[in-house]
Every structure is written in structure tokens, then in C-alpha cells.
Amino acid sequence: MLNSKEFVRELQLRHESAWMNPNVGSADAALTALPLTRADVDDAEARLERFAPFIKKVFSETAADRGLIESPLTEIENMRAWLNENKGAQLAGKLFLKRDSDLPVAGSVKARGGCYAVLKHTEDLALANRLVEMRDDYSVFATRAFRNFFSQYELHVGSTGNLGLSIGIMGAALGYRVTVHMSADARQWKKDLLRAKGVTVLEYGADYSYAVQKGRERAAEDPRSYFIDDENSVDLFLGYAVAARRLKAQLAEQDVTVDDEHPLLVYIPCGVGGAPGGICFGLKQEFGDAAHVYFAEPVEAPCMLLGLASGLQNAICVQDIGLTGRTAADGLAVSRPSGFVGETVKEMVGGGFTVSDEHLFTDLHALHETERLFVEPSACAGFAGAVELSKMTDYLESSGLGAHWENAAHIVWATGGALVPEGEREKYLAN
């Protein structure tokens, strides 16, 4: 295993590499030290339940789940066999795909945090203006009167693509004026889709951090504007954390036991850190020390792992060590991590892995061939973590995971893909 200094050197050399967090402690100790609690996740979950009648009414694809924005958990045995045979993995137990790539509304994990942050702000405005009480039927938010009210307000967000889609789609459905500040990495089809929804898209020839800053500045100019801050938002974070509760129920439905002798290993693609950080926080609340969470990032944009391993959090960016921040995994093309997330998960996340664009496309193609499932390149990052961890016999032995490896459940969190146009899908699969 590499120590933190050696790992940063490997990052500089653009090598695919692994870092195991030396600071990870017990879940109870880590959670107790945080200002956020289970009650905060309870509050977020209840708010999503209140808005379910509105979501069901406006987004018909959520009807089967009664207006909840949720995705399937699918066992991918054929992909597990392929990884073992073709990549030298030693994955025992079961391998699942958490298909946030197919989340309704926005087709990515950002439909969790992004939509929740919009709904939280919406409820705050509605309560402050005495438009509703919490016991009311929230389907009224779909009426013309409510849309007219929210058209007085504007939402701003900086994004590489998927967060902008979730906030743009949900915000427009509620009647807001929405401006998405897009970095140079954003895909054209995502910009086109937002504009088709009536969203204003401002494009910048710079990276994600610059787009976020511009969004923050524009929102500050107007008291009726609200900036959804991907770098520092507690609301986004809690929206993602709710996912762990629903995952717990899905695992129970599939008779998957999670305890000390049946560990749960979760591999999550990471950009600025909000989604994987919130999910990690939620998983530790639900499963404690039986949950082992690992982040996966591109070799050119490993911002969160760089911040964690160096201990500098958001005081360092990937350009500081000679990397570009540019990657085909547009959702992960982030140069500087969230300091809020880094500080929150620094004693919870088990570690992380970096992956080349080439291997993202290899795994994208293999998943489609073995399971007939399509995800976008960013969503494939977790496979590298599952493969590499399975080969780390020293770490598995020292961590105690090796003793229960045959009983483990592995989840690769697929973060996006459903909205990718057919022409783009064909290009990805041909790559």
C-alpha cells in the first residue's frame, strides 16, 4: 500500500493508483464529531415525501414509485465474471450496479441532491409567503398560480453538466427562471436539452471552479436569485444521504445481509464530492462499520483524493501537481474539491482509486455487452475500484475484510447515462 506522499507522487505521474485512508476510524466516532445528524436526514427524507405528489403529477415516470425519485439495484453477475476473467479481479460474493444512471427526472445521481436542493428552497419560499402548510397536498405546486409565483425568482448553479440538468429540469417544472453556468467540459447535448426546457445556459471556456464562481457572483446581484452551491451546500449533501436509507431497503428485498461478517463495499465516482460524500455519510449512518466506501476519480482530475491524501482539502487543486483536470468523464472533470465534503468524510471514506479514460470506456463497453446496460463514462469509474481492491491482499488482510471476502456485497454506483442521446451512446460504445 502507498502512503499518502507516495500516492500524491503517483497522481503526478498520471498512474492508476490506490490510496487507503489512514485516518478512517469507527463510524460512531466519525458521525458523533459532525454537526449533521440522523435528524437532518430524517428531515430531508420527510421533505421528499411531502413533494412526492407534485413530482408524481409533473414527472409521470415516477408514478410507479409514488413520486419518489429512485433507481433500481441490479445484480450484475455477468459483469463480475467478466472482470474476474479479463481484468484479473478476485471479486467474490455479489456485485451490484446501483443504477442512478436511470434515475427519473434527470437521469443521474444529481437528481437526488439537485432536485432536493431546489425543493428545499421552494418549500422555504412557499412557507415564508404562506402559500402552503406542511400538512397540505403538495400537488398544488404544479398549478399555474404557484408557477407564476416562482417565476419571480431565479436559480443559479455552476455545473459540468448533470447537476445543471437536475436543477434546470426541476426548477423549470416549478416555474423558476434558471441559469446554469457551464464549464468548458460540459457536453453540447446537455446544453441543448437545458435550453429546450427554457433554461438559460451560460458557457465558459474555463473549468468547473470558474463556472461555479461566476454563478455565485451573478446570484449575489439579485436578492430574488438563489445560488445552489455544489461546493458547500448542506442541502445537496443531505439529498444524497437519503439514498442510503432507500438502498438499505433494496438490499433487504434482495436478501442481502450487511453486518461485520457480511461487509458492504461501495465504489462511487467522485467529482467535487457532494454526491459521493453525502452517500458515504448516509451509508455510515445506516450500516456503521460494515459499510466500506471508496471514491473513484479520473487520473487527470483526482481532486478529492488529492485533497484528502495531502490533508489540504480545497487548498490544493490538480493543476498544482501538473494535471489538467480534463477527462472524457465530464461529470468528474473537477480540479478543486469541496472543502466541506472533505472535512466531513475524512474519517469515514475508506480510500479511493484513480482510473484512466481508456479503462472507463473498456468497462462501459463490457457492461453493455455483458448486461445490456448503458451508462456514461463517468458512471464506470467505480469498476476500477472494485477490481483493484480485490487484488490488494495485504490491505484486505489488515483491514479484516479478507476474512469475510466470500460474504461481501459490492456495489458500483452508476452515476449517469439515461438521458444520453442515441448518437452519443453509439460514439461511446464505439470508442
Tell me what each language-model feature is:
Residues 1-431:
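PLP-dependent amino-acid enzyme catalytic core
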